[in-house]
């Protein structure tokens, strides 16, 4: 068994200040890390889904009813098993991204990307936030807009996948 850290980062919207500091500190200390998992917006579903590249619609569909697992190359090796476990609880799609996600900047917009930049394996679990949720970062982003049964499925899937 390995130690598990639960870390809540601050200032993601200001340049991922907290996660960048921890990733750099771990790298400087030559600290090994099996996997960093960033939980980024997990409870919104929609009959429509946006994408950073139109071609992604053909692969991932046009309904925002899934959770996405976005991983760099090293973490991508874990994707099949994680996706199977998550998929038993909630529709799950995977997006392995090469080169730290630089070709698709929108996949770098959370606290996992500083870990990618430091050479760590990292995974973002997301409902795709603003690509489907019109309430994202708005006053209307309230619990009433969330799909709580979907969120429960995400939590159950994470417990199975990472447990």
Q: What is the predicted role of each segment?
A:
Residues 1-74, 80, 104-107:
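Acidic/histidine-rich catalytic neighborhood of metal-dependent amide-processing enzymes
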Residues 48-163:
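Active-site-adjacent substrate-binding region
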């Amino acid at each position: 068994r390995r130690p598990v850290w639960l870390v809540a980062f601050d200032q993601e919207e200001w340049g991922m200040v907290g996660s960048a500091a921890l990733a750099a500190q771990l790298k400087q200390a030559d600290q090994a890390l099996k996997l960093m998992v960033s939980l980024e917006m997990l409870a919104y579903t929609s009959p429509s889904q946006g994408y950073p590249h139109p071609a992604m619609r053909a692969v991932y569909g046009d309904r925002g009813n899934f959770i996405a697992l976005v991983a760099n190359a090293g973490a991508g090796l874990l994707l099949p098993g994680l996706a199977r476990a998550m998929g038993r609880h909630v529709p799950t799609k995977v997006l392995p991204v090469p080169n730290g996600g630089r070709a698709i900047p929108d996949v770098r917009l959370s606290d996992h990307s500083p870990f990618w930049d430091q050479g760590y394996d990292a995974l973002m679990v997301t409902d795709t936030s603003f690509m489907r949720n019109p309430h994202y970062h708005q006053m209307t982003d309230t619990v009433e807009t969330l799909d709580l049964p979907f969120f429960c499925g995400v939590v159950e899937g994470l417990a199975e996948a990472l447990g």
